[in-house]
């Protein structure tokens, strides 16, 4: 990969503005048989991300980019993993390793700040867009992620580019959010299991208190001044839930949709449920841009949606080109023998349509 590629990606995000890059939504569901499923959208309306899946075997060596070069931290995969990457195969946005650790990045513009890059410490410096591969390669659980972050320096290749924050979850059920504030890493326990973008995670949790009046179901009829008041339809207990696509509003909706969803008995049914919930967070091309200013001819700003069954080591995805759900079962992959590969998420970038025949 060329250094110019990451700079082009960063400058693209800068030129189009943070609003078009920051609409990813993550949720968490637990099945009746105890499987933990983390799911998310990846949204970018400014261009086609040319997303790929990567299969990374044990022993695979990678090196991070740093400002002005490609000679940052070197790391070798102790654990094999499957990742879903954007723009370049090195930029894994979501992935799962064979130990049962899930990792994903979400854009976090205008609020985070990494430590300043020190060339004397480049051997322990990793680009933010390459932290997910590092974590999946070298950590087996959230505790090891915390230890790793204490030993390394996460940096921006270009200081003009947006920062990101991360979601890490393991098969014990523990999930954390990592944010860098004023150059310092901060971990938050994510018991709710929801994540979007800016502002910070702690603010998003506090903001939920503004919606303490919301509840599942319908508000009861009642009299007011001799007038009988009745709901127009079902679901009036959620009247007032924010409906726009900004990160705070999506966080609130995701929290309520996730926590009110009926628990499914088994893991795969829970995976399918997560895709259904995330249908509500698909963002059509155009809503994030002024009229006549849409920069890309793509079918959706939601370029792909993934669901990871951490317990059973499976990662599922569908794309803006093909809504059929595809699955990698890590239990069927021999990471001591498989070769590294990076291939497009879609073999054919077209939605199949079944033509019904009436006889």
Predicted regions, residues:
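Structural recognition of the beta-strand scaffold that forms the well-ordered cores
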Residues: 37-39, 102-105, 167-169, 177, ...
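Bacterial N-terminal signal peptides that target proteins for export
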Residues: 1-7
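Aromatic/basic-lined ligand-recognition segments
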Residues: 180-184, 189-192, 200-201
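Bacterial N-terminal signal peptides
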Residues: 8-17
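Compact, glycine/acidic-enriched structural inserts
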Residues: 54-69, 112-152, 339-349
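C-terminus-biased signal that marks the final domain/tail of proteins
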Residues: 22-37, 45, 51, 148, ...
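Aromatic- and glycine-enriched pocket-lining scaffold segments that form the walls
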Residues: 142, 146-180
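A contiguous strand-loop segment
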Residues: 23-120, 160, 359
